[in-house]
């Protein structure tokens, strides 16, 4: 099929769908269905359970590609609304859903003590960021603000692509860690930077990208969303919604840095906490190559933001359904400055690494234990754990989680305590309530439906005839 035929087919999708008179309940049904696929709060409960159970390369595919089909569906439905008044309502709903999903995902991510569960909740947070972009784009389109609409949708589309680069890299890294140590528990890992230097370096690039630090790709897409939110405030249209989303996006960014500083520091820095971790070795070349390939995309988007935005503006034009002055947007001072800043930072980092290597050349580097404030016999048990690293956030957000602890208590009569253990876990309180309610609802529906299972063929023929009669009636009334 020719390229132009694909464009015609894409345009025809909107033409044939009955969205011209779509109602709010129908819109909510579409958003709920696609939102469940994307991991939208509170329908995200399946995602943190699926990623730890799946092999790491499957988790990379699920997070990088599969959940994006839900985002694609939401984008299609929003684009199909055209210029009707419901578009503004859809924008507000998407903006609110994105804020709640992003905050919920990142707070729960920062509390996790398992590498893959942390990355899974981070995927929920990134879906929230994408929905913030789509929401502000819908508000800009509804109010006629071309800049806000284009910045929001370009940022959302680019962040969708960016997440498909850095999240598979991180999941591949988690697979390397699991293969080398046979665990993904943060409280069992540590010091892997010495044993797995290439994995540590590539994983560091992925954490910097997901934290939206320049000169990497996450910075560019979130910059576009920020520009749309700032312009939405400055233009006076939907000021309150834009300001609230801007505040939430900044808060999300701060907690992301906390979560991934905890992840990288606990896993790769410090000392090994177990014998298996101390005996870990670097992954083979194929596994390293699997991490390096997404890094190429991360660097390309970060260092060439104008080219990356050019790749998504065609889709942005399709969303806007009106001719967009993409050339002026690509040449905007903010985006050009982002490119210059990225190259400047890359040059500074390269220069510092070169100076460090040159200054240390030929010198003996002494290694010793971390200074313990006068204590001369520190051990690996005295390091920060994943639990202690995020204790401050846990004390603030304790109502969001269902905490559990299992261990053996220390008797008061035991003057010199022996070996004891205590395991702490954090579960998603709202997610567990929602899943319990959903399972109970399905159980009751199934119990009622099972009454129709009589085992008599004449009853089943009657059901089929009744269904056909219902379809005929709805067709006559022009309801389907």
Q: Model-flagged regions — what are they?
A:
Residues 31, 204, 256, 292-300, ...:
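Hydrophobic alpha-helical transmembrane segments of multi-pass integral membrane proteins
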Residues 241-254, 279-298, 302, 310-311, ...:
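Polynucleotide-recognition surfaces of large bacterial nucleic-acid defense/processing enzymes
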Residues 305-342, 356-480:
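Aromatic-capped, Gly/Pro-kinked transmembrane alpha-helices
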Residues 61-67, 123, 287-294, 458-463:
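Select subsegments of transmembrane alpha-helices in polytopic membrane proteins
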Residues 98, 206, 287-301, 317-325, ...:
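Hydrophobic membrane-spanning alpha-helices of multi-pass integral membrane proteins
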Residues 167, 254-260, 346-363, 402-406:
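Hydrophobic alpha-helical membrane-embedded segments
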Residues 203-215, 290-309, 399, 468-470:
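Hydrophobic alpha-helical membrane-insertion segments
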Residues 1-282:
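Hydrophobic transmembrane alpha-helices and their helix-loop junctions in integral membrane proteins
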């Amino acid at each position: 099929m020719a390229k132009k035929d694909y464009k015609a087919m894409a345009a025809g999708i909107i033409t044939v769908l009955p969205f011209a008179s779509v109602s709010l309940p129908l819109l909510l049904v579409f958003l709920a269905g696609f939102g469940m696929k994307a991991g939208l709060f509170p329908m995200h409960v399946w995602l943190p359970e699926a990623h730890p159970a799946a092999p790491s390369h499957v988790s990379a595919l699920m997070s990088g590609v599969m959940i994006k089909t839900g985002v694609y569906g939401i984008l299609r439905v929003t684009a199909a609304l055209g210029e009707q008044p419901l578009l503004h309502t859809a924008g507000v709903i998407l903006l609110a859903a994105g804020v709640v999903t992003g905050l919920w995902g990142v707070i729960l991510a920062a509390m996790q003590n398992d590498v893959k569960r942390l990355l899974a909740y981070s995927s929920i947070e990134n879906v929230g960021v994408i929905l913030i972009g789509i929401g502000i784009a819908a508000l800009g389109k509804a109010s006629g603000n071309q800049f806000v609409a284009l910045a929001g949708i370009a940022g959302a589309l680019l962040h969708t692509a960016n997440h498909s680069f850095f999240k598979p890299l991180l999941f591949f890294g988690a697979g390397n860690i699991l293969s080398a140590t046979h665990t993904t528990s943060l409280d069992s890992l540590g010091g892997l930077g010495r044993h797995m230097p290439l994995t540590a370096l590539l994983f560091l690039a992925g954490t910097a990208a997901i934290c939206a630090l320049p000169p990497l790709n996450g910075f560019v897409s979130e910059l576009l969303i920020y520009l749309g939110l700032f312009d939405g405030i400055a233009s006076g249209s939907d000021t309150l919604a834009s300001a609230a989303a801007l505040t939430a996006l900044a808060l999300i960014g701060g907690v992301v840095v906390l979560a991934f500083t905890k992840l990288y520091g606990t896993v790769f820095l410090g000392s090994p906490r177990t014998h298996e971790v101390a005996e870990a070795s670097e992954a083979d070349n194929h596994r390293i190559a699997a991490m390096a390939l997404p890094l190429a995309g991360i660097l390309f988007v970060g260092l060439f933001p104008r080219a990356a935005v050019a790749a998504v503006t065609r889709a942005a034009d399709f969303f806007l359904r009106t001719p967009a002055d993409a050339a002026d947007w690509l040449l905007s001072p903010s985006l050009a400055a982002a490119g210059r800043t990225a190259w400047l930072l890359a040059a500074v980092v390269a220069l510092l690494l070169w100076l460090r290597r040159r200054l240390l050349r030929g010198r003996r580097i002494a290694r010793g234990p971390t200074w313990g404030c006068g204590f001369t016999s520190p051990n690996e048990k005295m390091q920060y754990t994943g639990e202690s690293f995020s204790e401050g956030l846990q004390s603030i957000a304790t109502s969001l989680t269902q905490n559990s602890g299992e261990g053996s208590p220390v008797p008061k009569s035991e003057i010199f305590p022996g070996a004891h253990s205590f395991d702490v876990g954090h579960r998603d309180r709202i997610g567990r309530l929602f899943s319990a309610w959903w399972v109970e609802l399905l159980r009751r529906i199934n119990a009622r439906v099972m009454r129709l299972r009589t085992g008599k063929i004449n009853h089943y023929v009657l059901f089929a005839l009744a269904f056909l009669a219902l379809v005929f009636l709805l067709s006559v009334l022009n309801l389907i």
